[in-house]
Structure formats: C-alpha cells, structure tokens
Amino acid sequence: MAVAVAVVVGSLTGCGSDENRRRASPPGASGPTGTAGCGGKSELTAEGSAAQQNAIALFNQVWGQYCPGKRVSYHTTGSGAGRQQFIAGHVDFAGSDSPLVADQIGPAAERCEGNPAWDLPLVFGTVALVYNLPGVPALVVSADALAKVFSGRITVWNDPILAALNPGENLPDTKIAPIYRADSAGITDDMQQYLTAAAPQSWAEGVGTEFQGGVGAGAVKPTGVIQAVRATPGAIGYVEKGFADQAGMSYAQITGASGAVPLTDDTAGNAVKAAAFLADGNDLVLDLNSMYKTEKPDAYPLVLATYEIVCSKGYDAETSDAIKSFLTVAANNGQAGLSAAGYVPLPDKVKERLITAIDAIQ
C-alpha cells in the first residue's frame, strides 16, 4: 500500500484577469460566498488526513475548472504527520481531523512568522462502524457498548448489553475483534472524543490521535482497517463513510435521542447542524460535544470535522493568494458534490464564519 497519494488536478494554462475577478458563487449556492481570485502560485502543497482525501480531490477538480492551471498536491499521510509537516514548513497547509494541540500552537506560530495558525473546518464527515458479522445486517450499538468493546470490557457479540440493543437479531458467541487505526489519525481522536462525551462512565481511556483502548489490532489507513475487518470474523472498526461505501461494507446504527439511528446523509446532516464553535475569532475550532451529545431526533452523532490548518499571516503573496483562492472555491462551488462522496456539506452558520476567516488570511 502506498504511503502517500498525490492528488493533482488541473491543466497548466494560465489564469487571466477575468478569472481573477470572478466570484465563487455557483448556481444554487447559499450563504456568504466570499471572493475567489485566481492569483497566486499554480501549485499548493498539503499533507495529512485520509478522511478528507476524497473531498480534496473534488475541491481540486473544481478549483482547476474555476482557475485553469491551479492544483493542490495533497499527500495522505495522516493528520498527525500533516500537522508536523505544516509546522516544519514543508507544506503550505495541513489537512487534519483534529485541530492543533496545545504544544503545537507555539511552533505553528513560529512557522507562520510569529502569527497564529488557524484551524478552518472545511469538510464534515461521518465515522462508519464497519463490522464482519454474517447474518446480522442491521447491527445496533450504543456509545456505552462501543466504549466497552474498544476497551475490552465486552468481548463477545452475544454479550447481554449488545443483545438488549438488538432484540431481533440472533447475535453469535463470536469473539469481538476491535480494529483501530495504527497510524496517528484524527479519526481516532474523533472516535475517542465521542466516547468521552457520550459515554463518560464507560470510557476513561483518554483521547488523542493514538488509540488508547489497549485492545484489538491496529491497521494503517482506512483501507487497512477495511481489509482487516473483512479478513477477521467478528471484527469491528471505524472508518470514514466514503471509504466504507466504496468498499461495500455494512456499518452499524447508533442509538440516539429517538432510538437506533442509521447512518444516512439526512441523519448525519441533522447532527452537523448542531455544530458550535469553542470561541469567537477566526481560529474555528469546533465544540464537538455540540454534535456528539445532540438531542436532535434522527441525528447520527458520530460525525467528524476535518480542518485545513493555515497561517493567518506570514505567507508570501503568491502562496497567500493561492490558498485564499482554493479555500474560497472549496467552501462554495466544491460543496455541491460532497454528499455523493460520503461527506456532509457545510451548514450556513459554519460557512459564514469560514468565509470571514478565509478573507482575513494575509
């Protein structure tokens, strides 16, 4: 399996002055649109999250159509590696399923010539709980059950807790095989943040991009998790919905405010609409509890926000102009195809704050 995937789209023709004045306002776009020029350098470099890989490919294609000759070379090495490469100045921005952590904020500011780096949520997605349990087409789990499965306190599928959640299913006595991301992955942090928020009485193992459960087997990248689940009877793992759909995998329902909730575009959208920010300003870190603990009916709570980590200031003009162009197009035109790719389009209240932050990049 390749260690990195380069996503490059777009022809190499120049971008004329007409394109420099166009606005990123596609037919049917809602909310603030911002202004996207086509100035700046032709190629941006970025690295990080596998969760946003397919979204970046879509955004890249749309940017190349909107601004011919523009492209992003994006390498999917994982959120942790992406943040490290950004801080080291090796890429123009990072893709990460988690914002910068406390001990990265200072080094990131140094990389940005003494200016703060911003976490900009450009993509929302969902975490699919893929499993290998023949004869059980509609598995239901709860946050409490998940916490106990991924910490080794529920070890067989016919455990009374799981049986009570699945009264119509004949769960086997198969041993449960948890599969987690072995590489530093933002989706692991999202999963553990969800368990901490939704099942605090059952998950005390902690959070972070490294799996803390202490049980199961690790696999690298979403494709590795899917391969491991497929190859292991009784396995359960977590991947982004788009990867699960591409692989044709079954995924579990999660109990919510109105009972068992399947993972669909609508149920994920209901959770994302509850998104709130931790603070004012342009560093747009989300309060994940607003989604993980939502009381909205028919809301699938295990969602993720994946960020683009950028310098607020400190780029050269060529890089700054290109980043603003790419992000503005992605936040507008690029949202149209996200549902088909397994993502959730930006809610208007998030998009409004995002456009303001993008416009403020210098």
Where are these regions (language model features)?
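Flexible, solvent-exposed loop/hinge segments that line or gate ligand/substrate-binding clefts
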Residues: L100, W203-Q362
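Residues that flank catalytic or metal-binding motifs in active/ligand-binding sites
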Residues: V123-G125, T174, I187, G234, ...
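Sec-dependent N-terminal signal peptides
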Residues: M1-A6
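Sec-exported extracytoplasmic/periplasmic mature domains
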Residues: A57-G69, I87-V91, P99, Y131-G135, ...
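Extracytoplasmic ligand-binding site segments that recognize negatively charged/polar headgroups
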Residues: T126-V130, V136-I226
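Second-shell loop/turn segments in exported
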Residues: S42-S49, R71-Y74, P116-A117, Y131-P137, ...
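N-terminal segment of the mature folded domain
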Residues: D18-A163, T223-A228, V239-A247
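C-terminal motif of bacterial Sec signal peptides marking the signal peptidase cleavage site
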Residues: G10-G14
